[in-house]
Amino acid sequence: MLIGKRLNDRYKLLKMIGGGGMANVYLAHDDILGRDVAVKILRLDYSNNEEFIKRFHREAQSVTTLSHPNIVNMYDVGEEDGIYYLVMEYVPGQTLKQYIIERGMLPIGEALDIMEQLTSAMAHAHHFEIVHRDIKPHNILIRADGVIKVTDFGIATATSATTITHTNSVLGSVHYLSPEQARGGIANKQSDIYSLGIVMFELLTGRQPFSGESAVAIALKHLQSEIPSPKRWNENIPQSVENIILKATAKDPFHRYQSANAMKRDIETALYPERINEQPFYIPEDMEATKAIPIIQQEQLFENVTDETIVLKGSKVDEQIRKEETDLSKKKKRSNKWLKILITTFLLLAIGITLALTVIPGFFIPKDVKVPDVAGMKYTTAVNTLVEKGFEVTEPNIVYTDDVETGDVIKTDPVAGRVVKENSKITIYQSGGKKKSKMIDFTGKDLESIRTELEEKYKQVTVYYIEDDRPKGAIVEQIPTSDQMVVEAEQELKIWVSKGPYQIRPGDFSRWTENSVTGYLNERKLTPDIKREYSDTVDKGLVISQSPKPGTPLKEGDKVTIIISEGPKPKVTKTVKVDNISIPYESSIIGEKKPQTIEIYKEDMQQKMDRPIETRTISESATISLEFVIQEDTKGRYKIVRDGVTIIDKEVPYPTQ
């Protein structure tokens, strides 16, 4: 259990605030500078893994090179008792991923502001030839004031180094992985730009562009499928903004932005009036052919190198000479063999007797040694001093006292100055500081009811508010915990207080598709309640309204009512017959009946007034009947024209009964 441990006698670990595959992150307090810091500790099961230790050190080297307001600062790096740790800036807030889950798709202005900060940070890293290789919302922190910080350079690498993944393994998170990384190839600055484009897509739509049943399925989509248009989920995205995403996520790195600064400049001007409706980004057809990028195998890097040792063969003459010399030497050695054995045996016996009588007893009789005075020393210094003198140091006895500083040595047993045998056991009495009492458990209590008591009892009380299922105002967690011994008057108390259950604030779903909104709600464990209504203004299948309204705080399991448009309401039509329409004949000369031309016009659901439905001639008055197909809330109409003069023009109302 690392909570409560001090690293380097300086960084006190307070609580775990995050974790990943290779390391855990703790909130800690820097006792020297009096500030909170984040301490990233390599998991103990990897502390003997050389590859993970190298990666851990690589993160420290990467970040210490950088100094940028949107990159987490690195303060210190160290190793203690097999614990490898990095000390970094503590950023209060949440990850960008948590922010997106809570808020959904972000307003365009806010999303562009975040992307400006992100591209600025990556441009700075790229300037120092550092490629992050794992850009994703999970590795980006956002403060309450909207400032973002890029973190987790654990798999970052210098572009001058070989960046080919060994044994075709893939580094990075599959939803944000560039095609070249998915192939197991080289990761470069354009790989980070691709990941930035995916993050921008998620900010503006509330979702990732690709999903699948497995990591392999998603990686294949990055390799083979074009990024879908973000307008499919957010029709308010201007063309200039969509173009940035499409260019950043081009399959071929050659077609992407060539630098993070170039992408940043496009983001800064994306909402200029002259750019809003610019032409869609596309890759010329002659450049769209798929090019297979081979994986660079490790053995290819060394194919011209050989480790064989070459032995040059001698001549047959030389071999014969060596053979004769060897035979002669063997004959001489046999003659002297027994004489040498006798002399050697005698000498060994003489030496053994001498050692047994003089030297060897000194090895087994311990020397007398005076116990040194280590009182007032730091514990580790005292241990080293005693070990150097040949003593064995046992576990320390902790003594609480106001007279000796915490951690310093009070005395030893045997006492200083006493003469004892070498290798004797020495017990150190170490100061535990002032008398301590067991920490009180405040969890579950209401903060306001005990705030005055806490402020009087402890040196300092720091309160953090978090979302929790426990009642608002209840203390959820505390540091120190109730199993620790503390000096109350000198103790700083940190408490975490519930501000109510975890809340989700859905965005505005207006004109979302039914599938998109149900997917969004299900992902956040909200219950969609779908209802349907006719609408003259919203296309069929799109969201008309929602309840509760956008931005309302909700908790998991809450119901959200969504009204989906059925399109315009169909209107009823009826057939109306008008009988006995009289067409009068009018002669200008008495007694003479000259034929007159009659044109009959009709307007209803099936006919317009732009041409006559019938033309006839009459020599006397006539009567006709007309049928009209009339829709609810509309009218029919007919017109009679005689010799070019309109003589009848009437409306036919929709029957109310």
Curated annotation (Swiss-Prot):
Task: Indicate how the chain sits in the lipid bilayer.
Answer: Single-pass type II membrane protein
Domain (PASTA) spans: 365-432, 433-499, 500-566
Task: Spell out where the chain crosses the membrane.
Answer: 346-366
What SUPFAM superfamilies is this protein classified in?
Protein kinase-like (PK-like)
Record's subcellular location: Spore membrane
Q: Which InterPro entries match?
A: Kinase-like_dom_sf, PASTA_dom, Prot_kinase_dom, Protein_kinase_ATP_BS, Ser/Thr_kinase_AS
* Cytoplasmic face residues: 1-345
Keywords, ordered alphabetically = ATP-binding, Germination, Kinase, Membrane, Nucleotide-binding, Phosphoprotein, Repeat, Serine/threonine-protein kinase, Signal-anchor, Transferase, Transmembrane, Transmembrane helix
GO molecular function terms noted in the UniProt entry = ATP binding; peptidoglycan binding; protein serine kinase activity; protein serine/threonine kinase activity
The Protein kinase domain covers 11-282
Q: Does the keyword GTP-binding apply?
A: no
Binding-site list for ATP: 17-25, 40
Residues found modified as Phosphothreonine:
162-163, 165, 167, 290
UniProt-listed CDD domains: PASTA_pknB (cd06577), STKc_PknB_like (cd14014)
Q: In this record, what's one Pfam family?
A: Pkinase
Q: Does the keyword Transmembrane apply?
A: yes
**Complexes and interactors:** Homodimer.
The entry's function note states: Protein kinase that is responsible for triggering spore germination in response to muropeptides, signaling bacteria to exit dormancy. PrkC is thus a germination receptor that binds peptidoglycan fragments containing m-Dpm (meso-diaminopimelate), which act as spore germinants. Probably autophosphorylates and phosphorylates FusA (EF-G, elongation factor G); the latter modification is likely necessary for germination in response to peptidoglycan.
Q: Which family does it belong to?
A: Belongs to the protein kinase superfamily. Ser/Thr protein kinase family.
Additional free-text comment from the UniProt record: PubMed:18984160 shows that peptidoglycan fragments serve as a novel mechanism of interspecies bacterial signaling that likely indicates the presence of growing bacteria and thus serve as a signal for dormant cells that growth-promoting conditions exist.
Q: What is this protein called?
A: Serine/threonine-protein kinase PrkC
Biological classification of the source = Bacteria, Bacillati, Bacillota, Bacilli, Bacillales
